[in-house]
Amino acid sequence: TQGVSSAASDVYKRQGSKGSDYHLSDLTPKFEVVESPGGLNIGVRRNAGDENYYWRVTPWIMPWYTIVPPYGDNPLHGHAWVPIDDENCFAWTFSYHPSRPLNELELGVMRDGGSLHVQLMPGTFRPVMNKDNDYMIDREAQKARKSFSGVKGIAMQDASLQESMGPVSDRSRENLVMTDKAIFMARRQVHDAALNLDKGETPPGLDEASQAVRSASFELSREIPFNEAPGDPMKVKKGVAHTSI
């Protein structure tokens, strides 16, 4: 799999995808966030012609799951951010397709540390690219404009920014904006769930119905809110492929 580059990740991720065309043609998306029985649904909206919007919807399921919206017939990916202690957590990443096995190209990209997966140091859960080696940033690739960040793979690009904030951030110095709406809504839900748990109430997101959801991407009339899309595109249907364009 060594020959499978991180560029291949983008190839299989978006190849033949109508959603990719919408993504590239509208670089100023709008965010909408609504509460769900088990957490939040985070919608990103782009123009899809004169009458429709192209939606990519990420479910955040209490207390630590996210599922990334798909492109075309490509796999679904997700994360579980599981605390270890007050300053560290495991970031478990999973990939699957509801109606078929993953193919060799998809598996090769993942083994090579592409897409949302990373290569690990043997015998550990620590990524090969990490803070101690500056995430193996490739300055020459940046100079040649082959890579904006110089860091290989979406997962490590994200991790490099997340870890740069330190283990515990000073919330009083944050400057959240409307595109951060999901952040403060999720914090509020976790805060409220903790208080209610202390009163003996069961936290949301633990029942089967709340967990039986998928991410989705779809076109929808501009007149219809994404959380009212016909056919419930985020509902799990066993053996049936996810809703994606």
Regions found by a protein language model. Name each.
Residues T1-A8, Y12:
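Single conserved hydrophobic/aromatic residue that forms the stacking wall/gate
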Residues D10, G39-L40, E87-F90:
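A generic structural micro-environment signature
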Residues K13-T58:
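Polyanion-binding catalytic cores of nucleic-acid enzymes and NTP/SAM-utilizing transferases
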Residues V44-I245:
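Peripheral, non-cofactor segments flanking catalytic/redox cores
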